[in-house]
C-alpha cells in the first residue's frame, strides 16, 4: 500500500528540521502544537538537548483554540516570553494541527515583528515533510535575514587557499559523534579557512559574516538553498559534495579551488568516477546505499573510486527530487542539471516502503540504517552493513554512528566489509 509504513520508520519531520537548524543561533523557536508534542524533538531528534542550551518550546495549542482558529493566545504567549527571555529572534514552526486550521504563519510573524522589534520567522511546516525541507528553509531564511550586506564585510583574508562556509550541517545528518569536527579538520588541515559552519559549532558573528568566504560548500541537500541565497547576495560560487574517503576528499578540495578561481559552481558528485584495478567478486555485488542524497552519493563515489565496486545504486527516501526540481531548478537549469543527471544514473528517489522493498529484491549488499534490514528480501541472504542515521532512527543507534569524513570512512568500512 502506498504511503504506509509497516516495518520501516519515518524520517525526522520538517518542524524538527527547523528547530535543529536554528538551535545554536540564539533565537527562540516555538513549535505550534499541543503540549507535550515537543518531546519527540527533544528526545529523539536533538542530541544537543542536554549539553547545549537553547530556547526551543511548544505553544501548548489546545483543542478549543484549534477548533476556533484562535491565534490570540499564541501571540500573547510568544510576546510575553520574548520580553522575558530577550532572544535574538523568534521562529514559529507549524505542525499538522495548524495546517488543518489554516494558520497564517507569515502574518503572525509580521505582527509579532512589529510588536517585539526583533526578527520573527513564520515557517509553514506541517510535519508531513522530512527534515531536509525544514533545515533548508530555516537556514536559507536566516541567511537572508541576518547576513551582513557587502559594504559591511571585509572580504576574504587573502590566504593561498580559499575561505569556505560549510552549509547544511545539523546533527540530523552528522550527529554528535565527531563528524562535524572531522569535516572542519579536512579543510583546515589543507590550509582552507572555515569561515562558518551552518549551523553547528559557529558563533552568530561568524554566521552573519558568511559573505566574506570565497566558496560555499553544501555538504547536504539541506545546504543547497542557503548556497543559492548566498550566491544571489554576494555572487559566491558553491560546491555540492562531501569529503568521504581520500579520493573524493581530494576531488571536493579541487572543486573548491576551481570554484574560487572561475566563479562557477562545481558538482564533484556528478563527475564520472574511475574504478580501481584488482577487482574481486565482492566488487561486483549489486550494492544499494539508502539515505540522504549527498551522503549516499559520496559513499557511492568512494566505493567505486577506492574499492572498485561497479554496481552501486543510491536509494534516497527523502524528498530531494522535489527540492531539486521545484524549488531550485527554476531559472537555474545549467547550475543544477548535473546533480539530477547524476541522481538518475546512480539510483532513484523512493519514498514508499513498497517501492524500496521492490528495488531491493536484487540486492547483494545494502548500506543503510539498521531499520532498513526489515526491508531486505526474505527468501535469501543479503549482506547488510549497518550505518545509523540520526535523522531516521534517532538516538537508538547513536553510539554506533561512525565518523565518515575523509580517511576515517575507509577505516570504518574496511572493518565491516
Name each region found by the language model.
Residues 1-417:
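An N-terminal assembly and electron-transfer interface module characteristic of large anaerobic redox
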Amino acid at each position: 500500500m502506498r504511503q504506509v509504513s509497516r516495518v520501516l520508520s519515518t524520517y525526522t519531520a520538517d518542524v524538527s528540521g527547523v528547530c535543529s537548524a536554528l538551535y545554536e543561533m540564539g533565537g527562540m523557536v516555538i513549535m505550534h502544537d499541543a503540549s507535550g508534542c515537543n518531546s519527540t524533538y527533544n528526545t529523539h531528534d536533538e542530541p544537543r538537548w542536554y549539553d547545549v542550551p537553547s530556547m526551543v518550546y511548544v505553544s501548548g495549542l489546545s483543542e478549543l483554540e484549534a477548533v476556533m482558529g484562535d491565534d490570540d493566545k499564541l501571540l500573547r504567549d510568544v510576546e510575553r516570553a520574548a520580553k522575558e527571555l530577550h532572544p535574538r529572534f523568534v521562529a514559529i514552526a507549524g505542525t499538522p494541527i495548524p495546517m488543518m486550521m489554516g494558520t497564517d504563519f507569515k502574518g503572525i510573524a509580521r505582527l509579532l515583528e512589529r510588536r517585539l522589534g526583533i526578527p520573527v520567522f513564520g515557517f509553514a511546516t506541517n510535519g508531513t515533510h522530512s527534515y531536509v525541507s525544514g533545515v533548508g528553509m530555516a537556514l536559507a531564511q536566516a541567511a537572508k535575514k541576518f547576513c551582513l550586506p557587502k559594504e559591511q564585510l571585509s572580504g576574504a583574508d587573502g590566504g593561498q587557499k580559499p575561505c569556505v562556509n560549510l552549509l547544511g550541517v545539523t546533527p540530523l545528518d552528522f550527529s554528535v559523534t565527531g563528524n562535524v569536527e572531522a569535516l572542519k579538520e579536512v579543510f583546515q588541515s589543507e590550509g582552507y579557512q572555515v569561515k562558518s559552519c551552518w549551523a553547528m559549532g559557529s558563533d552568530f558573528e561568524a554566521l552573519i559574516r558568511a559573505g566574506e568566504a570565497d566558496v560555499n560548500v553544501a555538504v547536504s541537500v539541506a545546504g543547497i538553498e542557503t548556497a543559492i541565497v548566498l550566491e544571489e547576495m554576494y555572487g559566491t560560487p558553491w560546491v555540492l559534495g562531501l569529503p568521504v574517503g581520500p579520493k573524493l576528499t581530494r576531488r571536493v578540495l579541487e572543486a573548491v579551488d576551481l570554484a574560487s578561481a572561475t566563479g562557477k559552481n562545481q558538482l564533484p558528485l556528478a563527475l564520472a568516477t574511475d574504478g580501481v584495478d584488482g577487482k574481486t567478486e565482492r566488487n561486483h555485488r549489486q550494492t544499494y546505499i539508502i539515505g540522504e542524497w549527498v551522503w549516499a552519493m559520496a559513499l557511492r563515489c568512494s566505493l567505486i573510486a577506492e574499492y572498485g565496486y561497479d554496481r552501486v545504486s543510491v536509494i534516497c527516501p527523502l524528498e530531494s527530487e522535489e527540492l531539486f526540481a521545484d524549488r531550485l531548478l527554476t531559472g537555474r537549469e545549467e547550475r543544477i542539471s548535473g546533480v539530477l543527471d547524476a541522481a538518475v544514473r546512480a539510483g532513484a528517489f523512493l519514498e514508499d516502503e513498497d517501492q524500496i522493498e521492490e528495488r531491493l529484491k536484487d540486492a547483494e549488499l545494502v548500506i543503510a540504517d539498521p531499520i532498513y534490514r526489515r526491508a531486505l528480501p526474505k527468501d535469501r541472504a543479503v549482506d547488510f552493513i549497518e550505518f545509523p542515521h540520526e535523522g531516521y532512527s534517532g538516538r537508538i543507534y547513536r553510539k554506533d554512528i561512525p565518523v565518515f569524513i575523509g580517511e576515517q570512512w575507509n577505516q570504518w568500512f574496511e572493518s565491516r566489509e
